[in-house]
């Protein structure tokens, strides 16, 4: 039933085009393939990721919205909840079903009433407030807890890298 | 925030503009063009090398084939009448036989000649391309030596006929014969020098030995001594060849050692199985077998059509006779299998090219034609195909080829099914592509009928033909089902609101398909039982029937029953919820939170008072029995209490009970005992291996069918490998927007 998912993706694309949320740009890669989207996420204000623009890619399954999509950043980003290869680990993208480890409540996992806009807003919120209790990047989580200045320094260098600016002289 | 966004946007545009300057674009374009040209040249070169290498290696297999075919004969038994019966009759066989008979070969010479031919054939098959070309040049130089010998003999005969005792060069006209012969000898010497790559002055001086009679005659040699000069030249040639071979022998031994060392390295690096695969690919055995079989088959067709004067109306029987006559040895059997494999692979690739479908996720062997090839080999081996007469081989080969066609049709169906079910959801697919896919699906409906008709005309009705007919009927039914599903999906894509009847239609199509499959299987079983009663009991037929009952009837029945049960459970879940009225929907002016489309005609109300489309909610409840919005559990007792409490709100309740009628499986008839009469061993046709392959295919089909049938109920099919070990803690406060509740 790929047509069912396609209609919903088209509706969401129309909605994102007419009422784009602040700091987020998302669209399909090309008109032939609505199941692969590309998006730009702006780092939230007053955080170490501020002024950064991070490209990411979202891949939708054929039975969307019954199953969640997969999201990964295509630039190098250093964050406790993002794997080294860019995959995003966030509760809204986890498949519905009770978490056996007990960290997540079931109503925070994927549901068909979620949308691309909510996914991206959750990712922006994750950038602002990392969750270091069950990290995807252990070294980033440890650094964020124990050496915040170093973490912010690395984040700032990554922001400059995404903007193609020279490295900071600090 | 907006100011920062504008600055960032402008900055990024400047950065992009600086990065994509005209110069860099130009350089990149030139680089890409050069790379594409290089790639094209490389591909053309590889293709040319492959064709050249295969063509050069072809005589090796042909020689081995001829040796195997005539290994039982001796030279005295070979006669003109027998040779004219063979496919090689348009060669100059009588002249060769006359030559052989007049030479009076004895037994030992024949053995030596056979070993020499085998050695040459193995060299053809195993040498690298450069050395293969050099070997051909050596053969050509030997041929040139023969030409030189012939010219020298002609010269001596001509001089003998003139009768002049003393050669007097008193006019230019008398130099004509001598000069031309000398010039011809020099030309041959130059060609040989280039071919043999002679690198030494003594070798070059020794080459023009057949010019000796001419020089001797021109120096005043008497007539009776001229033959001695010719004999000296022949002796010199033989000495030269022997010396050349002895001179080259150390190089040959060294090359052999190097080759063995390389082979050992290949096995050490890749292991045994992969090493065999590497050698197989490097020696181009597949291409060799295919070209060998095609060459012999074309020769047989030429003999049948041109020499025997048959017409084109007997093409089918001519083709079968040709295939039967060319398949006499294990080499040609392997060649036939490989050819069948390549033909099936080309047909499958052509179908993919026409439909524009991507490569499916099935096993790689399933789409390369290897299944058909292995089926051909195993069936021919088990029936003793190689030892049969031509008529028996023709009939059995027709049966084998129809089995191959049946397997090929199923492969094509697997290709077209994936493409047709995904095509309605791609927005920019052209109408031509839709038309092509529909045409191929219609061909899959028509071709099984044509195959069945021609098969019944050629072969008697048997348990084997019955199974082939059942498989053809199955392919036809599945193709019709895929076309109907395609139409339903097209209608769904073009409709505005999700259509509740669409799942019902898909479900009924699947049920009809499964019913037809079960019906065909039962007909085959009944026919087999009747044949056991009539003809008599045989272990082969009993084994076939038992395997058929287990694989085709019992497992399909089990799968169908589970499919129906899942469907009824889903229908029952959605029918417990009450339907919303059209007036209610107009008052709310709401959209379904699952598909984001307005609810105008139809909606279902959950116990927690949330509205969704019926089809959308049914799909989600198959994944998880909770409300998508508020995650309230919806259990069976909650339905009853909520629906009774909602009755007090004066809402219209329409509780439709789903049709939970389950089909009772019929018990298969017990097979009656028949008198124990065994058939001839040649008619024993063991289908276990064929059913092994077919069962494997049906296992994959069943898995795909289960996935596809289960997708109608939208179960959870996400691979959890990415999120296996790491799970995010629940510290994030994600407030679900309740706009839909307003």
Swiss-Prot record, chain B:
* Its membrane topology: Multi-pass membrane protein
- Gene3D superfamilies according to UniProt: Zinc/RING finger domain, C3HC4 (zinc finger)
| InterPro entries the record matches | HRD1_E3_ubiq-ligases, TRC8_N_dom, Znf_RING, Znf_RING-CH, Znf_RING/FYVE/PHD
State any GO CC term. endomembrane system
Question: Record keywords: Protease included?
Answer: no
Q: Where is the protein situated, by its record's location annotation?
A: Membrane; Golgi apparatus, cis-Golgi network; Golgi apparatus, trans-Golgi network
GO terms (molecular function) for this protein are: ubiquitin protein ligase activity; zinc ion binding
Q: What is its main location?
A: membrane
Disordered: region residues: 642-684, 722-742
Ranges of biased composition (kind: Acidic residues): 659-672
**What would be one Pfam family of this protein?**
TRC8_N
Top enzyme class: transferase
The EC number(s) this enzyme carries: 2.3.2.27
Report the stretches of sequence that form zinc fingers (RING-type).
592-630
Q: What does this protein do?
A: E3 ubiquitin ligase that catalyzes the direct transfer of ubiquitin from E2 ubiquitin-conjugating enzyme to a specific substrate. Acting downstream of probable Golgi transport protein eas-1, involved in inhibition of activation of transcription factor sbp-1, thereby playing a role in regulating AMsh glial cell size.
Listed PANTHER family: RING FINGER PROTEIN 145 HOMOLOG, RING ZINC FINGER PROTEIN
Q: What is this protein called?
A: RING finger protein 145 homolog
In its UniProt entry, the species of origin is given as: Caenorhabditis elegans
UniProt lineage: Eukaryota, Metazoa, Ecdysozoa, Nematoda, Chromadorea
């Amino acid at each position: 039933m790929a047509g069912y998912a396609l209609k919903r993706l088209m509706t969401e694309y129309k909605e994102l085009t007419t009422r784009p949320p602040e700091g987020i740009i998302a669209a399909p890669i090309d008109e032939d393939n609505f199941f692969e989207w590309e998006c730009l996420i702006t780092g939230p204000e007053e955080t170490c990721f501020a002024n950064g623009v991070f490209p990411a890619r979202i891949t939708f399954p054929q039975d969307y919205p019954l199953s969640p999509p997969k999201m990964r950043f295509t630039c190098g980003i250093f964050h406790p909840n993002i794997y080294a290869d860019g995959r995003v680990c966030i509760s809204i993208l986890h498949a519905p079903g009770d978490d056996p480890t007990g960290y997540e409540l079931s109503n925070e996992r994927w549901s068909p009433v979620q949308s691309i806009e909510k996914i991206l807003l959750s990712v922006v919120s994750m950038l602002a407030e990392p969750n270091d209790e069950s990290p995807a990047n252990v070294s980033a989580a440890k650094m964020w807890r124990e050496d915040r200045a170093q973490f912010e320094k690395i984040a700032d260098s990554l922001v400059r890298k995404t903007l193609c600016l020279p490295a900071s002289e600090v | 925030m907006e100011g920062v966004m504008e600055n960032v946007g402008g900055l990024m545009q400047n950065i992009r503009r600086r990065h994509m300057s005209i110069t860099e674009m130009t350089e990149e374009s030139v680089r890409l063009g050069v790379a594409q040209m290089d790639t094209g040249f490389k591909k053309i070169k590889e293709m040319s090398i492959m064709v050249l290498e295969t063509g050069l290696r072809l005589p090796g297999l042909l020689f081995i084939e001829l040796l195997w075919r005539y290994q039982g004969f001796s030279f005295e038994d070979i006669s003109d009448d027998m040779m004219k019966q063979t496919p090689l009759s348009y060669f100059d066989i009588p002249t060769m036989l006359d030559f052989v008979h007049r030479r009076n070969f004895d037994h030992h010479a024949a053995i030596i000649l056979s070993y020499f031919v085998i050695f040459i054939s193995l060299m053809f098959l195993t040498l690298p391309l450069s050395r293969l070309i050099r070997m051909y040049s050596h053969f050509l130089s030997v041929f040139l030596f023969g030409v030189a010998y012939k010219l020298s003999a002609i010269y001596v005969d001509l001089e003998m006929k003139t009768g002049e005792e003393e050669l007097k060069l008193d006019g230019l006209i008398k130099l004509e014969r001598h000069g031309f012969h000398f010039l011809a000898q020099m030309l041959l010497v130059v060609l040989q020098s280039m071919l043999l790559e002679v690198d030494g002055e003594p070798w070059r001086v020794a080459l023009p030995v057949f010019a000796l009679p001419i020089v001797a005659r021109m120096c005043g040699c008497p007539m009776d001594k001229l033959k001695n000069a010719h004999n000296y030249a022949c002796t010199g040639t033989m000495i030269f060849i022997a010396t050349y071979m002895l001179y080259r022998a150390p190089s040959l031994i060294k090359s052999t050692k190097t080759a063995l060392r390389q082979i050992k390295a290949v096995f050490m690096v890749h292991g045994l199985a992969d090493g065999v695969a590497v050698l197989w690919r490097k020696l181009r055995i597949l291409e060799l077998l295919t070209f060998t079989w095609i060459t012999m088959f074309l020769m047989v067709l030429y003999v049948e059509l041109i020499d025997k004067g048959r017409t084109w109306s007997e093409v089918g029987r001519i083709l079968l006779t040709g295939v039967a006559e060319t398949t006499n040895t294990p080499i040609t059997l392997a060649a036939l299998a490989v050819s069948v494999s390549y033909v099936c692979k080309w047909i499958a690739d052509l179908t993919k090219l026409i439909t524009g479908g991507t490569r499916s996720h099935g096993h790689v062997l399933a789409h390369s034609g290897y299944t058909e090839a292995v089926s051909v080999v195993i069936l021919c081996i088990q029936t003793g195909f190689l030892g049969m007469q031509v008529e028996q081989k023709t009939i059995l080969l027709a049966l084998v080829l129809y089995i191959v066609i049946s397997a090929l049709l199923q492969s094509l169906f697997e290709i077209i099914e994936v493409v047709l079910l995904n095509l309605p959801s791609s927005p920019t697919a052209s109408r031509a592509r839709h038309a092509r896919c529909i045409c191929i699906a219609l061909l899959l409906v028509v071709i099984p009928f044509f195959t069945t008709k021609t098969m019944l005309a050629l072969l008697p009705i048997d348990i084997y033909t019955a199974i082939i007919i059942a498989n053809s009927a199955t392919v036809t039914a599945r193709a019709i089902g895929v076309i109907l599903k395609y139409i339903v999906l097209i209608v769904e894509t073009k409709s505005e609101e999700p259509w509740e009847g669409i799942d019902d239609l898909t479900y009924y199509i699947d049920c009809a398909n499964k019913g037809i499959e079960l019906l065909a299987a039962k007909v085959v079983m009944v026919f087999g039982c009747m044949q056991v009663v009539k003809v008599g009991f045989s272990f082969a037929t009993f084994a076939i029937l038992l395997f058929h009952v287990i694989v085709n009837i019992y497992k399909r029945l089990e799968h169908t029953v589970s499919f129906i049960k899942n469907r009824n459970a889903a229908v029952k879940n959605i029918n417990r919820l009450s339907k919303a009225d059209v007036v209610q929907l107009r008052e709310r002016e709401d959209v379904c939170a699952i598909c984001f489309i307005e609810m105008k005609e139809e909606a279902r109300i959950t116990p927690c008072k949330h509205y969704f489309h019926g089809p959308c909610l049914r799909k989600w409840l198959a994944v998880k029995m909770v409300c998508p919005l508020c995650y309230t559990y919806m259990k069976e007792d909650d339905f009853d209490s909520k629906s009774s409490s909602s009755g007090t709100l004066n809402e219209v309740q329409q509780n439709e009970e789903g049709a939970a009628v389950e089909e009772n499986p019929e018990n298969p008839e017990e097979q009656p005992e028949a008198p124990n009469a065994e058939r001839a061993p040649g008619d024993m046709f063991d289908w276990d291996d064929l059913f092994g392959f077919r069962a494997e295919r049906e296992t994959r089909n069943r898995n795909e069918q289960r996935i596809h049938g289960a997708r109608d109920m939208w179960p959870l099919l996400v691979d959890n490998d990415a999120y296996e070990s790491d799970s995010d803690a629940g510290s994030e406060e994600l407030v679900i927007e309740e706009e839909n509740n307003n």
